Amino acid sequence: MINEELYKDLMALLVRVSNLRNTPQISKDTDVEYLKKDIVSVMTIVLRASREKAGTEDFSLGVDYSEALEYMDRCRIWISLLLETKAISKHIHFQLSRMADSIYCRLSDSSVQKTTLI
């Protein structure tokens, strides 16, 4: 199921971002916390979609993938800001951006599939 894969990839991104705290350039008051919150918001939406597909939640609530896309777009912006402020290296930026872009593309595909089913 695509939602399980998305959730795992989001978890991997969250872990990778959380591990940034171990670098000396990252302080507690940086954009990392905002980035983590946005990732968790996307995870919540993907989890809700999985539950609806499994029938454990009311399908009439619907899943708003556009909201998830907005959060992922913000994640991509936070990642770029971390590079601009030199909080992360270009190498780490590339890795995080690649992960975020992959998730964004799959969410975008899910959004298209969802709207065509309705």
Predicted regions and their residues:
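Amphipathic alpha-helical assembly/interaction segments
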Residues: 1-118
